[in-house]
Amino acid sequence: MVASSWRGCRRAVAYCARMLGVLTDTLDVTLTHPDAVLPARSRAGDAGYDLRSVERVTIPPEGTRLIPTGVAIALPEGVAGLVTPRSGLALEHGLTLLNAPGLIDPNYRGEIKVILHNTAEHRYTVEIGDRVAQLLLTPYWAPDLQVVDQLEATDRGVSGFGSSGRS
């Protein structure tokens, strides 16, 4: 038990050291299309970087299309990219990401593409330069998984789906 705990502690320390090394002020980005725009945050303090379309794409009612952004990024080890929906597109036009959030692994170097789904009863056309999603950069933890006979007990236990009440 002690050896196992020590191994976990060493991994946690190594992870923190890695994170301190990867959280820099810059991130390498390649624009892979002439109409590509560098992802940017709309306001200081915003967490997400806007991703824009490099093609005009019409999405039929209840249809799904793959929207290219013309952007590729080099995420450092220990950091993942989450592609998330834009709330305004969802509320005003019924557009969302089919696989929200989309996951970009740090070893992926290809173009970021957005799986946009139209839940509305009318078609929607994405124009070149339209903001179609947001990119959130986040650290992650990827420990080795181990099978145990029983999980440590908590106050909640196995209660889920509505177990905390309505109000």
Question: Can you say where each PLM-predicted feature lies in the sequence?
Answer:
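DUTPase catalytic domain/fold
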Residues: 2-167
